[in-house]
From Swiss-Prot:
Domain of life: Bacteria
EC number of this enzyme: 6.3.2.8
UniProt organism field: Sulfurihydrogenibium sp. (strain YO3AOP1)
Main location: cytoplasm
Descriptive protein name: UDP-N-acetylmuramate--L-alanine ligase
InterPro entries: Mur-like_cat_sf, Mur_ligase_C, Mur_ligase_C_dom_sf, Mur_ligase_cen, Mur_ligase_N, MurCDEF_pg_biosynth, UDP-N-AcMur_Ala_ligase_MurC
Length: 454
């Protein structure tokens, strides 16, 4: 960016998972950063400690001196800061456009797909960090190795997850992309699945002629768009058609071990068959960059996932795991990973649906996602600013789950969920808190409660 023109950058919703990493990178590059959010959080405290000025609550006064205003997809047009910025003639841009600006001066590696973006981005960043690449990395979750959502590197590469939710990933200019999967999601923005597929085709074709698109050949929706991709394609998966192929895949001690081409064998550090695919995407990208397989293997076998990705919050006689899963496909993957890892233990899933629109569009799929837990607890919907939809609620979902023969409870809020758990948990239980809303607070509360009981 032209520093003579842009010095002060304001972020509306600066505490959001997609926003704070970009803000941190810009802080580290010497820009003056201000921001606003609805509540305090450890993320906001970290940004303040790095030099950002952050306001709690949205006000016209917050933007008056900004050179540009960056907003997240959660910010509505009637936000007072958005309105004031436009009145003052201050440019307002979505976070994806600011990310694209950061990528413009780098070789971009953009990780896309309906699921697994944060983990795959973290894996690629971890592998490249073990080489001389020293990449800049921006992810949607806090990675333990960085202590934050972002790392400013000195190398020529920028690795980021790309957000398809509002189409802003089409603003990026990546050299290499990965498409891990395509699923029906973000119904408020896309008309249907075909509309989503078209966006991913456009995304893949954004890479230059010397770039590449790594794609999951085992995902039927991804496979269906291959004829329309006009760039080099690297296919990964279990299929014999894959360029980067996993075979002899087996479960050992709750984690997957597999062989890749004639490169060698990997024993993943993170559970779940979905993470085999995330690892294959990573291998495809890093192999394209001529990273030695021994470096890839060591990095993946010692990889520690981002926050809220099968994050163990408490481990003793009872296990508490927190996960961001909020789509039926993600829920099934996380619950399957838990069953693989904790074979004979009772699993209790506590799920907080996220957005009425998502629950409405995928109601049956959500209801069928809970056949693995021994007990399921469903809370009321976390609205994320949406208005309620008639006959769409956590209580209705619990009723539908019960129709499929599963043991389910409905609670209206997290406090009720906590009280219920305290009454039913027993030695040996594995508790998973699942969702993209405030459900993570319950995992912290439970971890504290169980620690104090020791």
């Amino acid at each position: 960016m032209f520093r003579g023109k842009v010095r002060k950058i304001h972020f509306i919703g600066i505490g959001g998972s997609g926003m704070n990493g970009i803000a941190e990178l810009l802080l580290n590059q010497g820009y003056t950063i201000t921001g606003s959010d609805l509540k305090e959080s450890p993320t906001i405290e970290r940004l303040r400690n790095l030099g950002a000025k952050i306001f709690i609550g949205h006000s016209e006064e917050n933007v008056k001196d900004a050179d540009v205003v960056v907003y997240s997809s959660a910010v509505k047009p009637d936000n007072p800061e958005m309105i004031k910025a436009k009145q003052l003639g201050i440019p307002t841009i979505p976070r994806g456009e600011m990310l694209a600006e950061l990528m413009r001066f780098k070789y971009g590696i953009a990780i896309a797909g309906s699921h697994g973006k944060t983990t795959t981005t973290s894996m690629v960043g971890t592998v490249l960090g073990k080489t001389g690449f020293d990449p800049t990395v921006v992810i949607g979750g806090k990675l333990e190795a960085y202590g934050s959502n972002a790392k400013l590197g000195r190398g020529e590469f920028l690795v980021t997850e790309s957000d398809e939710s509002d189409g802003s990933f089409l603003k990026l200019t990546p050299t290499i992309v990965s498409i891990n999967n395509i699923d029906l999601e973000h119904i408020g923005f896309y008309k249907d699945l075909e509309d989503i597929k078209k966006a991913f085709v456009a995304f893949a074709n954004k890479v230059p002629f010397y770039g590449a698109a790594a794609v999951n050949i085992d995902d039927e929706n991804v496979k269906s768009i291959l004829p329309y991709i006009e760039r080099k394609v690297i296919k990964f998966g279990f299929s014999e058609d894959a360029d980067i192929r996993a075979y002899d895949v087996r479960l050992e001690n709750g984690r997957y071990k597999f062989k890749v081409n004639d490169f060698g064998e990997i024993h993943l550090s993170v559970p779940g068959i979905h993470n085999v695919y995330n690892a294959l995407a990573t291998i495809a990208i890093c192999n394209e960059l001529s990273v030695p397989f021994c470096v890839i293997k060591e990095s993946l076998e010692n990889f520690k996932n981002a926050k809220r990705r099968f994050e163990i919050k408490y481990s003793n006689d009872i296990i508490v795991i927190d996960d961001y899963a909020h789509h039926p496909t993600e829920l099934k993957a996380t619950l399957s990973a838990a069953r693989d890892y904790f074979k004979d233990r009772r699993i209790i899933a506590v799920f907080q649906p996220h957005r009425y629109s998502r629950l409405n569009a995928l109601f049956e799929e959500f209801a069928k996602a809970f056949d693995i837990p021994d007990i399921t607890i469903v809370t009321e919907v976390y609205s994320a600013g949406e208005s309620p939809i008639e006959n769409v609620s956590g209580e209705k979902l619990a009723e539908k789950i019960r129709e499929y023969g599963n043991n389910v409870y409905y609670v209206s809020n997290l406090e009720e969920a906590e009280n219920l758990l305290k009454n039913i948990i027993q030695k040996g239980d594995v508790i998973l808190t699942l969702g993209a809303g405030s459900i993570t607070q319950l995992s912290d509360t439970l971890a504290k409660y169980l620690s104090e009981k020791e």
